[in-house]
Amino acid sequence: MSLIFADEAWEDYLYWQKQDKHMIERINKLIREVQREPFTGIGKPEALKHSLSGFWSRRITDEHRMVYRVEGDAVLIAQWRFHY
């Protein structure tokens, strides 16, 4: 699956690259996992509801979540920092 980053998600990704190598390693691991298995696996995948229906989240840490949506054979990453 290919990756598409929303503007905010790309800014978040660059932030983690500069701020925390451990965090970026975890994020890269989640990217690989989502590309293989978008709805199962590590990070406790959870389908979101209400205004975020169609999006999924995975835990990066207790504070931060990966929020994404599968569109055909692409994954749109919406955000990496904080809760949705």
Please give the residue ranges for each predicted region:
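Compact soluble domain cores
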Residues: 24-37
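Enriched for short, Lys/Arg-rich terminal
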Residues: 2, 8-25, 42, 48-49, ...
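Short, functionally important structural connectors and interaction interfaces within domains
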Residues: 31-32, 40, 44, 52
